[in-house]
Amino acid sequence: NSGLSALIIEKTKIKKNQEEKEYDALWISSLCDSLLRGKPDIEVVELKDRINSLEWIIEVSNKPLIVDLDSGGSIEHWKYSLRTLYKLGISAVVIEDKTGKKVNSLFQNGKLQEQDTISNFCEKIQLGKHYIEQLNI
């Protein structure tokens, strides 16, 4: 979730049974990215600010980078977020099917969270997939 953690992961290798092991990829979570900024994990950190963290990581690592995008934002903003991340060289994104006010699953205190409808969530995934195909990924 930072250049430092990415550098540690990039350099970490262990030998086990005569075989060298290392991490296959990096994951940047919205939780850690928010907490590093002293903010709650409620989608308050905007993509433009998260890009700063992504650039630090990309600078020191050649490993594939997977980005947790929470809900992915509004359907209208979704393709623009994907385009920006594609241009940065992000390998994959993960989005949640939650709607309404963001509540981190780790800290939900028993509160129920609303899920998007299957049709809405499928539409978001299909739009994202279609847009990525247009970018020739």
Q: What name fits each language-model region?
A:
Residues 5-6, 13-49, 69-75, 94-119:
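Glycine-rich, proline-tolerant flexible connector loops at the mouths of alpha/beta enzymes
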Residues 5-13, 125-130:
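Short, well-ordered amphipathic alpha-helices
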Residues 40-67, 88, 109-137:
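Alpha-helix-loop-beta-strand connector modules within alpha/beta enzyme cores
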Residues 78-92:
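Short, electropositive alpha-helical surface patch
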